[in-house]
């Protein structure tokens, strides 16, 4: 299996409690499982202002969000290893981890896995798609040594 090449961009004023590029690569590799090519993706960690702006611009949602996925699409005749970009909001991830009583790094891992699956074309708009995506996310998270991300323990 070939490693995903990660271009990590940190556009957050607070850089504490962020995953390392090695952690992000491990989590993305588990989701992408590249066999032949060596895919490349950008992971941009942002603050709420940038997340809010992008979420409003591209999804029409007037609030910051945990992860946005921007798949890279090019003509079929051009072979490029780029699979896309993930934009992850540090404050939203931290807040969700606290609210859901999950370890912070487990939630970061889940956001990388979730976003990576979106880059591969998975979605959760329809119920059957959501079930398949959640099943895959759970399988990947368990393989990484984390718990089921959809079970909230209280």
Swiss-Prot record:
It holds the Pfam family YbeY. Zn(2+) binds at residues 114, 118, 124. Binds 1 zinc ion. Transmembrane segments: none annotated. GO terms for molecular function: metalloendopeptidase activity; RNA endonuclease activity; zinc ion binding. Its cofactor is Zn(2+). Its EC number is 3.1.-.-. Keywords: Cytoplasm, Endonuclease, Hydrolase, Metal-binding, Nuclease, Ribosome biogenesis, rRNA processing, Zinc. Its main location: cytoplasm. One of its GO terms (cellular component) is cytoplasm. One of its GO terms (biological process) is rRNA processing. It is an enzyme of class 3 (hydrolase). It is found in: Cytoplasm. Single strand-specific metallo-endoribonuclease involved in late-stage 70S ribosome quality control and in maturation of the 3' terminus of the 16S rRNA. Belongs to the endoribonuclease YbeY family. This is Endoribonuclease YbeY. It comes from Histophilus somni (strain 129Pt).
């Amino acid at each position: 299996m070939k490693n995903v090449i990660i271009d990590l961009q940190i556009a957050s004023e607070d850089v504490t409690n962020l995953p390392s590029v090695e952690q992000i690569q491990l989590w993305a590799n588990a989701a992408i499982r590249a066999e032949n090519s060596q895919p490349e993706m950008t992971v941009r960690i942002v603050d709420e202002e940038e997340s809010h702006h992008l979420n409003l611009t591209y999804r029409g949602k007037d609030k910051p969000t945990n992860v946005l996925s921007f798949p890279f699409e090019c003509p079929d005749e051009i072979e490029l290893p780029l699979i896309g970009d993930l934009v992850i909001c540090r404050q939203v991830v931290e807040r969700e981890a606290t609210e859901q009583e999950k370890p912070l790094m487990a939630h970061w891992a889940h956001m990388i896995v979730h976003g990576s699956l979106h880059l591969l074309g998975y979605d959760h708009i329809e119920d059957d798609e959501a079930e398949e995506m959640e099943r895959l996310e759970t399988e990947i998270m368990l393989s990484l040594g984390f718990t089921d991300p959809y079970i909230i323990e209280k």
